Amino acid sequence: MAWADKYRPVDISELIMPSDELNSIIRWADSWRNNEVIKKSLILYGDPGTGKTTTATVIANYLNVPLIEMNASDERNADSMKRVALMSSLYSDLLSERRIPDRLILIDEADNIFESRDPKRGGDYGGITELLNVVKETRNPVIITMNDYYSFRSKRSGREIIDNSLVIEMRPYRRRNDQRYREFINKCLERCHYILKKEGKSLPENDIIRIIKENEPDIRSIINDLEAYAQDSNPGTRNKKIDIYRYVIDTFHSHDYDKLINSFSDADFDPDYYIKWIDQNLKEEYQDPEDLKNAYDILSIADLYSRLSYRANYMLTGISQEIAAGVSLMVKNKNRSTGRYSMPDIIKMYSSRKGINGARTLLEKLAALNHTSSNVIVSYLWFYRIIKRTAEFKRISRILDLSDNEVKQI
């Protein structure tokens, strides 16, 4: 089991969030426990990986009730919202005389509930309107999660749902120079040390801090990277991962191109590894569409030379690296602060404890099915994670002859 799942918080004291928000959530849960409800639903919104669904699970544990979840993969039009959410929330156990809740309803990714303007077109018409009815009439607590709060607020009935809910933004800090940021880093560091101790692993303190700062505030990504680093038995490889971070910073922020090029002679990584890091983090560094276009134009040329070096002339390898190092030369609006750089997705897969060989064969099989490359297919694994929930996946698995280990990696 992946560490992010194995060490997912189960107790409310394990949640990594500011004290004010945590206390507000506890008071909301206690209002249901004490039959003193003011707001019947709780909205948790924020970026992926900030703990929205985990928080809902922990609250269910706190209330000692089962969690009934309707997520983005379920059909969520008006009829299904009535049938599943409304029935689950309105009717308590008929054999119970308790006036406290006997279940917690989770509506996950509510900002993805779309409403058709024309009822005849079907789809998600009326879904949010019915969700409003649930929020108003429920006899059990309802938690609604979303990534795009402002998009949800602009939808039909969205604002009224918000007005009838306690709203918590899952954002651990506002600025990196405030007290909340330091508290968040310390809590993450404490959690990482706890996980490493339970797993019998160790990493230098500086490496752990680097992992946290590369991924924050995405706690899930922090733990995923922690696992990938800790499972790498070769300290030299771990040092290479830390070292590449400094080169990425220099690529995006250094004003001395010649100095950057000369420093590659001391680098302990190959050009393809470097190009993957730049590609992964380019969109986090530059926001202007024209800047991104120009930077990707440069990177595509570097990638072409990198591929040619494997097929024709190894001497082209160094040229590909020098070209990639020049991405910032074509950018007008540079980011003044250092971004949250993360390890390339494909490198994470290769580095994880699930096995380099298994990851490689999985990508090769999916790439062959789609007539593309392994580098391309890694960006579409999210699609196969959705397909995996359906009966159709069994047929695909048989066609590709996927092993149990390969299936687990999707």
Curated annotation (Swiss-Prot):
Listed GO MF terms: ATP binding; ATP hydrolysis activity; DNA clamp loader activity
Biological-process GO terms, alphabetical: DNA replication
Residue ranges of coiled coil: none
Record: residues binding ATP: 46-53
Signal sequence bounds: none
ATP-binding recorded as keyword: yes
InterPro entries linked: AAA+_ATPase, ATPase_AAA_core, P-loop_NTPase, Rep_factor-C_lsu
Keywords: ATP-binding, DNA replication, Nucleotide-binding
Function: Part of the RFC clamp loader complex which loads the PCNA sliding clamp onto DNA.
Family to which this protein belongs: Belongs to the activator 1 small subunits family. RfcL subfamily.
Subunit structure, interactors included: Heteromultimer composed of small subunits (RfcS) and large subunits (RfcL).
Protein name in the entry: Replication factor C large subunit
Species this chain originates from: Picrophilus torridus (strain ATCC 700027 / DSM 9790 / JCM 10055 / NBRC 100828 / KAW 2/3)
